[in-house]
Amino acid sequence: MTISSSPFHVALHEAKHSAFGTSVGFSVTAIHVAASQGHVIWSNNFPVPEELAWLWPRNPEATTTLVRHAVATLLSPHDGDQFPTLCHDSILVAQFGRAWYGLPTVRGDVPMPWLVLLRQAHAAVRSWYQQPGVACTLVQLAHHLARAGTLDAQEWTALWQCEYGQWLRQSTPAGASTPPMPLRIDTRS
């Protein structure tokens, strides 16, 4: 994503994406931060909108959770608020919305209204961001990313496990569980 700001602001943006996504179970392949742009490359467990029609009939509950987590990950740099301008993140959220609206009723399972799912994603980001230590830890992570420039999966995993994950993990209510993520098909070839 191109951001008109300092390398630190770019790094903070990407830190929020990568930390929130990792906290809900997505795997990072690489993180790139440059002077005016950055991006996170996700592994195959981060969904793409084109997969929803295939995933939904197989496991509607897990697909709903997967999409909520993916959309929240895209919203995370904005702290749960609306996108200030049109950007790659907002375009991808809109693509998820279009794909979601096209899902059929399956065995009585009706996709929840998109705006409800979107509100839940916004609320999840706000709740995560307000956990003790998250905002400060994200700033520290952003400084690390700005200095490093690029992290591969192994470097990110080491950082997450040793330094940042303890503060940035999602708090889960006792007894709560997350449905298993559906198997992913490769639709990009």
Q: Predicted regions span which residues?
A:
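Soluble catalytic regions of large protease machineries
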Residues: 2-189
